[in-house]
């Protein structure tokens, strides 16, 4: 198939979050978004061109090349996982997916060059001298990009990125070509931010920004799609066209074909942040665009390297630091300091029962004594866990039973799904003014306003929240046998107001 597409690489300033850049300095943060996007606007005009092409896609990128990625996961990101091992395995799986997408479209093999993954100690210490891992989830993703970029700029030559497999280090480039920070954000939707068309450039200062081939992604568990999208921007790819850009011509974009504008949200470079696994390829326009940018020398891929099977690390290989089927241990990059694990065979050394680096109930290659604390309680409704003495694994994390009386900094409450809460607390959290619950027979969030009016929403209380004579589950009050005596000692959850008006309407603004 031969494709003839007309596209423009001149992109007007978009409101889309990816190309709005922020700065950690308060004075710069006070500027308008239009001013903050000035760097990207100029950058995009620098790469402006119109290109008409008629080439078979298979001939555009004939030689397989490798793009090496330096990955950092901060403390807010690793909280999604029960262990560093689990986080590492997830990151490897996501990048295998990213590599498949790029190999299919651009003949580019994407590999992890290095990985910085903080330990529980790193995160509990909250070390301020490690900004790359200690950023708050409440900091905007744009601020995180500037902080991450500044850290990378100030760190070259300090070996901040260590090759993930030391015994293969000579086959790795000294530095990754792209750096990605995995983080978490208070925003719920997946999103990312990156510096446009910076591939094969060093991190540098330009117009007050620390600019380079870097990206920040907050998209768990959909990391691979957002990472693929952001790397696309670093390579110089613009967004696919959608109804908005086709209708108001607010920005240049990649059309579906020479005759149809709207790409219908089908591809990786879709500007929306609602990614799905339907977006599993790049559009033909994106493929042709990258080829044109390289051919016309608007971007260079000269830093990419020829693939070497010896240096490629994947899941299912001894030495990647992840214990997988057929392995007893995997010391990864720290085998010299690990007497429990044979790094060449991924088997435990003679006399070893376990690996200290791998399991919480292992000490000096043997099981810790029964009763040794291996996981601290994180809140009044979370049980502490203790080693059994017959296993190196810390028992599964468990919560105290729902309905158990608890106390925290907010006062008395009861346990529900592992948190100390109450119906009144949930009212206070969901409304701007109400701290009183009402209608205790209901397991729908029911809150009383100042004049005594009780509103019932369609939102359920957290599973395990107390209701009259029972506990709430899936919006229903489930009776508990013999509960009357124990419950009678607790304050009534019923709102005794002079006038009780039950509103069955869902008032969205009231709760959100």
Curated annotation (Swiss-Prot):
Q: Which residues form the Peptidase M12B domain?
A: 65-306
Keyword field: Disulfide bond, Endoplasmic reticulum, Glycoprotein, Hydrolase, Meiosis, Metal-binding, Metalloprotease, Protease, Signal, Sporulation, Zinc
- Kindly state what the record says about how the cofactor is bound: Binds 1 zinc ion per subunit.
Gene3D superfamilies reported for this sequence: Collagenase (Catalytic Domain), Disintegrin domain
| Record-level GO cellular component terms | ascospore wall; endoplasmic reticulum; endoplasmic reticulum membrane
Compartments (UniProt record): Endoplasmic reticulum; Spore wall
Q: Which residues form the signal peptide?
A: 1-15
- Which residues belong to any copy of the Disintegrin domain? 315-402
Keyword match Metal-binding: yes
Which cysteines are disulphide-bonded?
246-254, 374-394
- PANTHER family per the UniProt record, alphabetical: ADAM A DISINTEGRIN AND METALLOPROTEASE DOMAIN, ADAM METALLOPROTEASE
Protein's name according to its UniProt entry: Zinc metalloprotease mde10
From which organism does this entry originate?
A: Schizosaccharomyces pombe (strain 972 / ATCC 24843) (Fission yeast)
């Amino acid at each position: 198939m031969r494709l003839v597409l007309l596209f423009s690489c001149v992109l007007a300033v978009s409101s889309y979050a990816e190309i709005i850049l922020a700065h950690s300095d308060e004075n710069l943060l006070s500027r308008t978004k239009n001013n903050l996007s000035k760097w990207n606007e100029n950058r995009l005009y620098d790469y402006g061109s119109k290109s008409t092409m008629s080439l078979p896609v298979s001939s555009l990128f004939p030689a397989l090349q490798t793009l090496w990625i330096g990955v950092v996961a901060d403390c807010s990101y690793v909280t999604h996982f029960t262990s560093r091992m689990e986080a590492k395995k997830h990151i490897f799986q996501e990048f295998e997916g990213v590599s498949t997408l790029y190999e299919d479209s651009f003949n580019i093999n994407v590999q992890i060059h290095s990985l910085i993954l903080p330990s529980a100690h790193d995160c509990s210490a909250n070390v301020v001298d490690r900004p790359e891992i200690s950023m708050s989830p409440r900091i905007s993703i744009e601020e995180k990009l500037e902080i991450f970029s500044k850290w990378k700029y100030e760190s070259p030559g300090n070996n901040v990125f260590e090759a993930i497999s030391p015994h293969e280090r000579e086959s790795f480039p000294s530095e990754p070509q792209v750096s990605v920070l995995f983080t978490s954000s208070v925003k719920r939707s997946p999103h990312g931010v990156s510096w446009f068309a910076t591939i094969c450039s060093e991190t540098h200062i330009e117009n007050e920004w620390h600019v380079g081939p870097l990206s920040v992604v907050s998209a768990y568990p959909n990391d691979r799609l957002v990472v693929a999208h952001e790397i696309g921007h670093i390579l110089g790819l613009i967004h696919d066209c959608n109804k908005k850009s086709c209708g108001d011509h607010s920005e240049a974009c990649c059309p579906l074909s020479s005759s149809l504008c709207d790409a219908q949200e089908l591809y990786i470079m879709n500007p929306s942040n609602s990614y799905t696994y339907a977006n599993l390829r790049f559009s033909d326009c994106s493929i042709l665009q990258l080829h044109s940018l390289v051919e016309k020398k608007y971007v260079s891929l000269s830093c990419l390297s020829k693939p070497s099977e010896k240096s490629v690390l994947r899941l299912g290989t001894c030495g990647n630091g992840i214990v997988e089927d057929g392995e007893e241990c995997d010391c990864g990059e720290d085998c010299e300091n690990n007497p429990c694990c044979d790094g060449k065979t991924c088997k435990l050394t003679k006399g070893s029962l376990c690996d200290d680096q791998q399991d919480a109930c292992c000490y000096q290659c043997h099981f810790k004594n029964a009763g040794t604390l291996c996981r601290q309680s994180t809140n009044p409704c979370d049980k502490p866990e203790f080693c059994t003495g017959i296993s190196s694994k810390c028992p599964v994390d468990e919560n105290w039973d729902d309905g158990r009386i608890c106390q925290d900094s907010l006062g008395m409450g009861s346990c529900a799904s592992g948190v100390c809460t109450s119906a009144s607390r949930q009212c206070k959290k969901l409304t701007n003014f109400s701290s009183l619950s009402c209608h205790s027979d209901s397991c729908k969030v029911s809150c009383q306003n100042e004049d005594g009016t009780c509103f019932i929403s369609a939102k359920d209380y957290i599973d395990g929240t107390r209701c009259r004579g029972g506990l709430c589950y899936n919006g229903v009050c489930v009776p508990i046998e013999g509960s009357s005596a124990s419950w009678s000692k607790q304050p009534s959850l019923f709102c005794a107001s002079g006038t009780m008006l039950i509103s069955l309407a869902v008032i969205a603004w009231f709760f959100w």
